[in-house]
């Protein structure tokens, strides 16, 4: 597990990255085909649904209900996909987190390991705080790290 952060005033970037045992395509596809996430890791996601467009098409808007530090929260985000690079951008547009951030983009990147055994999963959080009092979203960095670990356990158990 590796963590990086770059913070300059109101703008910052947080990164968490881990190796997983799962196939890169399988890991990427469960996030692209989001309907299975609440049953795979229900302690993290309580529901997710496309509210505009088709959920697997770039430009769709999804509503995610999730648990962060024991609190139920909801966010609407615009999603873009790059199947070639196994990259998904989640651009927050509405919900509780947008009370603290002008911009909140969470990017998932899944790369196969060079030896063909498993993958490297990276979550990148690019954000711009509304003001100096808005927190650096370290809680979301921990949330995405938990996503990596718990989804890996679920997917490997189902192999």
From Swiss-Prot:
Tissue specificity note: Laticifer.
GO CC term, one of those recorded: vacuole
CDD domains: Bet_v1-like (cd07816)
Keywords, alphabetical: Cytoplasmic vesicle, Vacuole
Chain segments annotated as coiled-coil in the UniProt record: none
Top-level taxonomic group: Eukaryota
Compartments it resides in: Vacuole; Cytoplasmic vesicle
GO biological processes: defense response
Function: Not known; MLPs constitute up to 50% of the soluble latex protein.
Protein name per UniProt: Major latex protein 15
Organism per entry: Papaver somniferum (Opium poppy)
Lineage: Eukaryota, Viridiplantae, Streptophyta, Embryophyta, Tracheophyta
């Amino acid at each position: 597990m590796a963590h990086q952060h770059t913070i300059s005033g109101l703008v910052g970037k947080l990164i968490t990255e881990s190796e997983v045992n799962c196939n890169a395509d399988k890991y990427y596809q469960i996030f692209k085909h989001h309907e299975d996430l609440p049953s795979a890791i229900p302690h993290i996601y309580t529901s997710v649904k496309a509210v505009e467009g088709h959920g697997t098409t770039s430009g769709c808007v999804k509503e995610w209900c999730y648990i962060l530090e024991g609190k139920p929260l909801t966010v609407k985000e615009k999603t873009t996909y790059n199947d070639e690079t196994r990259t998904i951008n989640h651009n927050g547009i509405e919900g509780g987190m947008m009370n603290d951030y002008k911009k909140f983009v969470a990017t998932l990147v899944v790369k196969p390991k060079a030896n063909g055994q498993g993958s490297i999963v990276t979550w990148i959080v690019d954000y711009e705080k509304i003001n100096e009092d808005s927190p650096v979203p370290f809680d979301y960095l921990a949330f995405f790290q938990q996503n990596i670990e718990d989804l890996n356990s679920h997917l490997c158990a189902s192999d």
